[in-house]
Amino acid sequence: MYAAPVDRLITELSKLPGIGQRTAQRLAFHVLRASEQDALGLAEAIREVKERIGLCEVCFNLSEGPRCRICEDERRDRSVICVVEEPADVIPIERTHEYRGVYHVLGGALSPIDGIDPEDLKIVELVARVRDGDVGEVVIATNPTTSGEATAFYIAEALRELERDVSVTRLASGLPMGADLEYADEITLGKALAGRRAL
């Protein structure tokens, strides 16, 4: 329909998560209207991130070198490991300024339907970190989905088999601040009730 380079750009943009054909077209035309400097700046940023960013050799978070900034930070408490599914999950936890431990990024969650088994995740590496390190607590912060819950239980069981004195905790889940009870689904409300605490 369009010139081949435009069609190719639309096709490539539509491969991004959450970007459909129409949004890809709008983005492609935005790039065409942008200055050459801005368009080439975007292309260079994409190339640079693919060339320079890899995974931390310790926690598997995104890193520009062998280790990520968090693993290199001597002020972090290495006795506490927070387990997350993806590198993007580290960001909201860091924004709270409440957590000073280190992380372990699994690279996904268990999902037999999608063909994601324990061997496809960084679970063996997590168990090795706990076994070989001075870890006192593992905070499992996988998403509150069926896959996230299955992953959390699998990890908890794998860590119990180590027979070490390691506390395995799960992030509390429940109602967000300002939520109305009438709009809460049964699972969320049930978890909020189960996780209630004294005032």
Task: Describe these PLM feature segments.
Residues 17, 36, 49, 61, ...:
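Conserved phosphate/pyrophosphate-binding and hydrolysis machinery centered on Walker-type P-loop NTPases
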Residues 2, 99, 127-199:
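Long C-terminal interaction/binding lobes of large macromolecular proteins
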Residues 38, 43-48, 57, 69-70, ...:
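Core recognition of P-loop NTPase motor domains used across DNA-transaction enzymes
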Residues 14, 32, 47, 60, ...:
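Signal for well-folded cores of large energy- and translation-related assemblies
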Residues 1-6, 11, 15, 25-90:
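Cys/His-rich Zn2+-binding cysteine-cluster or related metal-binding knuckle/ribbon modules and their
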Residues 24, 72-142:
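Extended interfacial segments that mediate partner engagement and assembly in macromolecular machines
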